[in-house]
A protein has these predicted regions:
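N-terminal secretory signal peptides that target proteins for export/translocation
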Residues: 1-13
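Bacterial N-terminal signal peptides
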Residues: 19-32
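Boundary/entry segment of secreted carbohydrate-active catalytic domains
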Residues: 40-89
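Substrate-binding cleft and catalytic face of glycoside hydrolase catalytic domains
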Residues: 62, 81-222
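Noncatalytic carbohydrate-binding groove/subsite architecture in carbohydrate-active enzymes
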Residues: 161-285, 291-292
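Aromatic/acidic polysaccharide-binding cleft in carbohydrate-active enzymes
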Residues: 261-356, 362, 369
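Carbohydrate-binding surface patches
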Residues: 340-393, 398-402
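C-terminal beta-strand-rich structural cap/linker in extracellular carbohydrate-active enzymes
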Residues: 409-444
Length: 444
């Protein structure tokens, strides 16, 4: 089954990649003759260390990416994963041990056309499969994700939309019967935020007395990253908070695959996905996995943690450092405001080492300058209680390079500075930030 999943996910990702590239190529073709090259851009980030952001949910999460012992724990624990989407039930103890919510990808336990056929070929057989799994794993606390990308005909769904709805209904009723009223069941885990599909799905569920406790979809278009937050807010308003759908008992909005193929190794783009998904108010997210640049097994199945680490020697790549810094700071998030949607930042009162932190970067979205100058305005540093009164604070900026699959064992420090805080505002200008790169400012 795993070999089949590897091949199917490769086919599915290639086909989905071709769609994304066609969209991006069309945009570039239209823009070639009318948009001049942009050499430099400017972005301002204002951080108020006195204004906390309570209730922030971490978007650190993964799709497959590991085996029983690899990658080693010391490369996973610092990332503090909150969601793990997989069909590998034998990994349940390890993944939940990291603090992650286990999301069972039910369709991967069944297969896509072979060897069992499709659920609509024999609904009774599908129900029996779901029932057997539910009984075998009744004691495990997990989210049940019924089917993967039913809007992508090849390879994940060959039936009609109505047949998918029926497939969900059959699985839902079995799970509710076997596991009771508290088990979290969800979907439809479609390839993008398609409001028409979601509306039709939820209307069907409402009309058939079904629940959708976890409403899920994927965000994989690297050219529309900043649309993610509006999508989540729209889903919250249109569905989760809409009295018309109260009977569905929607508890969660899970973007259970984020980050497309072009962005998979780019630090700033990874940060942008985390930023906009968090800002939208999603319950959780999981990093998607794609083909390595040189070919070989999909990053879902080569023990690379979805591409964050090098397989084999198990050493971190640049994007691993983005996830680490993101996870270091999410529990003490403070307000950050910016004036350029491509220049994004997430700030925290503490990174766990008694240092305030700002994680920021400059990512590509349409025609973009190759570099940016970023001005950081730091407010209310005195309220952090760092150091002794009257003593200087140490500011350190480290660069997370756009280095693809290369190993990055340590981050290069690009600036060190001591400041004495004499008022409530400190301004710091960071010039020549390269597109796709991210930076970490620590204050302590």
């Amino acid at each position: 089954m795993i070999k089949q999943l590897t091949n199917l996910r490769r086919i599915g990702r290639i086909k989905w990649l071709s769609v994304l590239l066609a969209i991006a190529g069309g945009l570039l073709f239209v823009g070639v003759s009318i948009i001049p090259a942009i050499a430099q851009t400017q972005g301002d980030l204002t951080i108020d260390f006195a204004t906390t952001q309570p209730g922030v949910q971490s978007m650190s999460g993964f799709l497959y990416g590991v085996e029983q012992d690899e990658p080693p724990d010391h490369l996973i624990e610092p990332l503090q994963p909150r969601l793990w989407r997989t069909s590998r039930l034998n990994l349940y103890p390890r993944l939940t041990g990291f603090g992650a919510t286990f999301q069972l990808l039910l369709s991967d336990t069944w297969g896509y056309g072979r060897p069992r056929g499709w659920p609509y070929d024999d609904y009774t057989r599908w129900e029996n499969h779901v029932r057997n799994l539910a009984r075998e794993h009744k004691g495990k606390k997990m989210l049940w994700d019924i089917w993967n990308e039913p809007d992508l005909r090849d390879p994940f769904w060959h039936g009609t939309r109505q047949q998918f709805f029926e497939t969900y209904k059959r699985a839902y009723r079995v799970l509710r019967e076997e596991l009771g009223p508290d088990v979290i069941i969800g979907g439809p885990s479609i390839t993008k935020y398609d409001k028409g599909f979601l509306t039709a799905f939820l209307n069907y569920c409402r009309d058939n007395n079904l629940e959708v406790n976890s409403l899920s979809w994927h965000e994989l278009n690297d050219q529309t990253i900043n649309a993610i937050a509006p999508h989540i807010r729209d889903a919250n308003q249109s569905f989760r908070q809409n009295p018309a759908y109260r009977s569905l008992k929607i508890q969660r909005l899970d973007v259970n695959e984020i980050i497309g193929p072009t962005a998979q190794y780019r630090p700033a783009e990874n940060l942008a996905y985390l930023y906009y998904t968090e800002q939208g108010g999603a319950s959780a997210a999981a990093k998607a996995c794609w083909e390595p640049k040189g070919g070989g097994p999909n990053n879902c199945f080569n023990k690379s943690l979805d591409g964050l680490v090098q397989p084999g020697p198990f050493a971190p790549r640049a994007v691993w450092w983005v996830y680490k810094a993101y996870s270091d700071g999410f529990s003490t998030r403070v307000r950050t405001q910016g004036n350029n949607p491509r220049v994004i930042g997430l700030a925290s009162q503490s990174n766990g080492q008694n240092q305030a932190q700002v994680l920021f970067g400059y990512f590509e979205q349409g025609p973009s300058a190759r570099q940016a100058t970023v001005t950081l305005t730091l407010r209310n540093l005195q309220q952090l209680g760092l150091g002794q009164p009257g003593q200087p604070l140490n500011l350190t900026i480290s660069r997370i390079p756009d280095s693809g699959e290369a190993v990055v064992k340590d981050l290069a420090i690009v600036k060190r500075q001591q400041i004495t805080v004499t008022n409530q505002i400190v301004r710091l200008t960071v010039p020549n930030i390269r597109i796709h790169e991210a930076y970490i400012l620590t204050i302590g």
